[in-house]
Amino acid sequence: TYSDDDGETWANPTDITPMVKADWMKFCGTGPGAGVQLKNGTIMFPVYCTNGNGKQSSFNVYSTDGGKTWNSGGSPNNGGDMQNASNELTESCIITLDNGHLMQFMRSYNGVITTAVSTDNGLTWSETTKHSGIVDPYCQMSAVHYGTLTDPADGRQKEAIIFSNPAGGGRKGGKVRILSLIHI
């Protein structure tokens, strides 16, 4: 749905499921994260699905016409034929980096945060990277792109990402971290 009067009234909602859910998907839904608008105007939201084997996969949906029509983007773990639980990826969040690339942070069964990068607006994704220093107790996380900062210690430019999730077992002990990507 949408509002064109600052939220005073809303249009009737439109079900986009038929536009984005493939036949092999048993379930398709959004995570609790927010969407992003790319530099070219594309609107993108992270979603996840299950296949016929009940295995989960992260992917994204996007609109290039202001939300009138929607398409499915790529998946870092090719959910249609996935069999291996250790490769499952579920709820996720997407941020846009300074160079225009997308970074997707994904919940998984691996016990650590998993990420992938797209250089083509989410149509394809890099191999996933597991970050051993960031615990993932299988709970939704949040990532927000902050911008580029200069490290006073070494003068290097570092792209800052504000990241939050539970820091230990279960859904407790929330922690907010500043992650950085070093610009070479």
Indicate where each model-derived feature is located:
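Asp-box/BNR beta-propeller blade signature and adjacent active/binding-site loops
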Residues: T1-I182
